[in-house]
Curated annotation (Swiss-Prot):
This is Formate-dependent phosphoribosylglycinamide formyltransferase. GO terms for biological process: 'de novo' IMP biosynthetic process. The gene is purT. GO terms for cellular component: cytosol. Mg(2+) binds at E266, E278.
Length: 394
């Protein structure tokens, strides 16, 4: 792809659907290559909007609003960064010649756990936890009885761990169903019931489909709390056999989804047995560690790939870790304190996302640190993150 000049005739325009912290880093990397960036989200002053050329505040599940903005901006590429989008409309746009990253089908399938699980397990034959889908409480009771407890209950459409729970006793079925419905995104009333896997560890394998083939980043270990990313580190130590199988599964599912871009493939590993979990066709929360761990961050890799540019060699610079900085209260605006102490941690870097307000558990920043090994890096990242405090503006 030949690239134009921003704000001039012939500019290469990227429309970001979703403007959070991941979208912000994508916008920055795109602008480094002279791309004109338009950021879209449901609320004003979202992180990517603060660095984009223009922005729009709309519901991305409203196809008329999407149609209006796309018609106004006439982007070369539509780059979804979140799940809360009318993906059926993206399919129609793609059929009409609009380029959606990586493909509209990939975006549509992966926002729905039923679609991606059926693709991975039933079409591609990838090993997964035992599972079933239920569209009613009574149907869920039957599947829980078959799969057994403990099991994991998730809405088929949700993000950041919303609506997910571990069902440890059949008496909790009603509560798990209610929690799933409260956390579900969109109009779906279906859940997935999964066998509870006693895995040794879980990884994200960042997989890049680009003009010269498929490339892999070193595996990323991570910890989730209530289904949401809390810390990650790279590289995650794996046996050669487990890594080879992880790459095989990641390449299979990303090839089936198609298109160019970076995918976050989540996998469970137990005694070198690798089980497919989920895939996101975009930069991944756990991949924020690559801003310090690699020569090319996941965001630069994504931008290069979607623009049809070579990716080159991906190099791990040092054992590294990331740790989230979370709000613990609701404020309209905050100031950050403790930054001096945070940045006294050896090799540390901070990314404060610039979100306009806080609520308990909202991710407001991330600490990034290197170490002599991942254990040291994880300890440093935690110390750096925990030094940062948020206080309301008086």
């Amino acid at each position: 792809m030949n690239l134009g000049t921003p704000l001039k005739p012939g500019a290469t325009r990227v429309l970001l659907l979703g403007s959070g912290e991941l979208g912000k880093e994508v916008a920055i990397e795109a602008q480094r290559l002279g791309v004109e960036v338009i950021a879209v989200d449901r609320y004003a002053d979202a992180p990517a909007m603060q660095v984009a050329h223009r922005s729009h505040v709309i519901s991305m599940q409203d196809r008329e609003e999407l149609k209006r903005v796309i018609g106004l901006e006439r982007p070369d590429l539509i780059v979804p960064e979140i799940e809360a989008i009318d993906t059926e409309f993206l399919l129609e746009l793609e059929q009409g010649g609009q380029r959606v990253i990586p493909t509209a089908r990939a975006t549509n399938l992966t926002m729905n756990r039923e679609g991606i699980r059926r693709l991975a397990a039933e079409e591609l034959g990838l090993p997964t936890a035992r599972y079933a889908f239920a569209a009613s409480l009574e149907e869920m009771r039957g599947h829980v009885a078959q799969i057994g407890c403990p099991c994991v209950i998730k809405p088929i459409m949700s993000s950041s761990g919303k609506g997910q729970s571990v069902l440890r006793d059949p008496s909790q079925v009603d509560e798990a169903w209610r929690y799933a419905m409260e956390g579900a995104r969109g109009a779906s009333d279906t859940v997935i019931i999964e066998e509870f896997i006693q895995f040794d560890y879980e990884i994200t394998l960042l997989t890049v489909r680009h003009c010269n083939g498929t490339s892999f980043c070193p595996p990323i270990g991570h910890v989730q709390i209530k289904g949401d990313y809390h810390e990650s580190w790279q590289p995650m130590a794996m046996s050669p056999a487990a890594l080879a199988e992880a790459r095989r599964q990641a390449e299979a599912v990303t090839t089936a989804l198609g298109g160019y871009g970076l995918f976050g493939v989540e996998l469970f590993i137990s005694n070198d047995r690798v089980l497919f979990s989920e895939v996101s066709p975009r930069p991944h929360d756990t991949g924020m560690v690559t801003m310090i761990s690699q020569n090319l961050s996941q965001f630069e890799l994504h931008v290069r790939a979607i623009l049809g540019l070579p990716v080159g060699e991906i190099v791990n610079l040092a054992p590294s870790a990331s740790h989230v900085i979370l709000a613990d209260a609701s404020f309209d605006a905050v100031r950050f304190e403790g930054l001096e102490q945070a940045l006294e941690v050896a090799t540390s870097k901070l990314r404060l996302f610039g979100k306009p307000d806080t609520r308990p558990g909202r991710r407001m920043g991330v600490a990034l640190v290197q170490g002599k090994d991942t254990d040291e890096a994880r300890g440093r990242a935690e110390a750096c993150a925990h030094a940062v405090r948020m206080v309301p503006l008086s």
